């Protein structure tokens, strides 16, 4: 089995300009690691939020795939769709190996994306 390639970008950026927009292939998994869903999107932040809040019908919701464990960034949606199809055709072991290239502990890569940060008060105390 060939080793999957490591992605070039490990943190998503969501540019405001339409021409600068990226596409993403991502994997969300359940906390038990039993379920793993692969998808494609033009807005990774929004899509991850939808998965975390069970706003998406289907496999990911049914199996509680709330943790972003992997993603790749593409300039063209056609490339992202082709990559999604490629990954979906793999056996589970190969998908696991791909995740573990950048995320060996399978931590939620988006765990800090949706937190509200409180400003530090005058005394330096953070509420």
Which ranges hold each PLM region?
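GIY-YIG nuclease catalytic motif and its immediate N-terminal context
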Residues: 1-57, 61-71, 78-85, 102-104, ...
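Short arginine-rich
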Residues: 62, 85-98
């Amino acid at each position: 089995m060939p080793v999957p390639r490591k992605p070039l970008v490990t943190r998503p950026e969501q540019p405001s300009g339409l021409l600068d927009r990226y596409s993403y292939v991502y994997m969300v998994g359940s906390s038990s690691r039993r379920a793993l869903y692969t998808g494609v999107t033009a807005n990774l932040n929004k899509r991850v939020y939808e998965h975390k809040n069970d706003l998406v019908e289907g496999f990911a919701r049914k199996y509680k795939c709330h943790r972003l464990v992997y993603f790749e960034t593409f300039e063209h949606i056609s490339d992202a769709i082709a990559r999604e199809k490629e990954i979906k055709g793999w056996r589970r072991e190969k998908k696991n190996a791909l995740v573990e290239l950048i995320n060996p502990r399978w931590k939620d890569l988006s765990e800090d994306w949706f937190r509200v940060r409180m400003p530090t008060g005058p005394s330096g105390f953070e509420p």
